[in-house]
Amino acid sequence: PGMELSLFSRDAIAMATAVALSHDVFDGALLLGVCDKIVPGLLIGALHYGHLPCVFVPAGPMGTGLSNKDKSKVREQYAQGLVGRDELLKAESAAYHSPGTCTFYGTANSNQMLLEAMGLHVPGTAFVNPGGALREQLTREAARTVLGITRGQRFAPIGRVVDERAIVNAIVTLLATGGSTNHLIHWV
């Protein structure tokens, strides 16, 4: 199977988000997403209920583990039969060893950057590592922000925030930063 399953899982996440927000009991939504299809799915689902203020809370990238170069070397050795499955799993576990998005600038980290460019994150949160005091403060600030939007003079539901300017900002940011080409399928 190819990317058709990728879009299927994204759309399932979008539907689950839309159903969860459809109960008409919320004043706003704080959306927490990490990996490749989750964040686009949350965004699509939230836009189905564009009347709600929404703030996204990025996971941030996990700290550095085994380098991509070393991980690739072990994968190549495994493909050649030079190392066993245990060594491969050990390398994978060392590379992806903690909470957060992957350590490279792929789809998940591009998601975080694009949503910040669209104005859907607290500014400066896209690449703050999880688990630290700053991440905790920024998450609390996201909660205060969505509450402020729902109660304050600057009521801004997601359907008003995500307009053609926000989408252009996201695409320009994607191109300017060398973000993931997987976003072509999410933006079309």
Where are these regions (language model features)?
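Short helix-coil transition sites and intra-membrane helix breaks within transmembrane domains
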Residues: 103-105, 176-182
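Anionic-ligand anchoring segments at beta-strand to alpha-helix junctions in alpha/beta enzyme folds, i.e.
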Residues: 1-8, 182-185
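Flexible, glycine-rich loop/tail regions that form catalytic "lids" or insertion modules at the edges
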Residues: 171-173
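Active-site cavity-forming subdomains of large catalytic enzyme subunits
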Residues: 6-162, 166-169
